[in-house]
Amino acid sequence: WVWEQYDHIIGGNTFQRPGGDAAVVRVLDGPKGLALTTDVTPRYCEADPFEGGKQAVAEAWRNLTAVGAKPLALTDNLNFGNPEKPEIMGQFVGCVRGIAAACQALDFPVVSGNVSLYNETQGRAILPTPTIGGVGLLDDFSISVTLAFKAEGEAILLIGGAPGWLGQSLYLRDVCGREEGAPPPVDLAAERRHGDFVRGLIAAGQATAVHDLSDGGLLVALAEMAMASGIGAELEALSGHLPHAFWFGEDQGRYLVTVAAAQAVAVLEKAAKGAIPAQRLGRTAGNALILPPERPILIATLVRRFEGWLPSYMSGGAA
């Protein structure tokens, strides 16, 4: 709803509009494209500034990768409270160190930025918010992919592991009413391996849809892919996992990828050879999310709930 209030197709060069992992714009009249994204998770930064700083950079890197772009550089917008308070300065230092560690590990340099301090209301500071704006390059913008499912009958693959980290997750906060625990750790070496693998699938034309996993975890990402397309998903029954942790854990360095059913085995074998954790979750099908043994959730219901609440809230209706 927010980005729809503004002109986001100036000059007619917008190839992928906002609303996905990254927007893509064409560079002049040639084949190249630029992908752009902004990311930060303030609750992670408050719980562990160093890991939160790493995660902000890593998520921007993932979002660019998810559309097929090679991440080039970033700008940081560091928003904090009063640095004269030791705890706020500690947040600032920790986040900056985390950002630096991620930039070095991912070859993703900071080329500009700004700092906004003393952000308080009645002496209460904002959450530490080191926003990362990332840009990536596509040699051919036409090969970029989106998060929307493309056709029924395709295999849905999870790239990256599934430990089920619930600390500081939306599930823990919004369902359990608890804001506690450490945020998910960011393994920068794994982040790079997994992202390079996914980018290779896109370049080879094997990936038909890609979405990185972040807020809300696996099931939220699946719902977003389904809502973007109107195509549902039949998911396989879990074995050996706690359902709430598997579906809502916010572990880092992960992607959902769809491929043609005939290519699924080859992609999984390729992942295994590269020591990339990967598994099949199910297939695209129908008009609902089917998660045994739970009742199906119609995509139309998800779209109505997801797209309707903010316009209603902004117009004075019920939240």
What are the residue ranges of the model-derived segments?
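Glycine-rich phosphate/pyrophosphate-binding loop regions near the starts of catalytic domains
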Residues: 1-164, 170-177
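Glycine-/charge-enriched secondary-structure boundary and capping motifs
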Residues: 31, 95-102, 106, 111, ...
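Long hydrophobic segments that form regular secondary structure
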Residues: 1-23, 27-35, 41, 53, ...
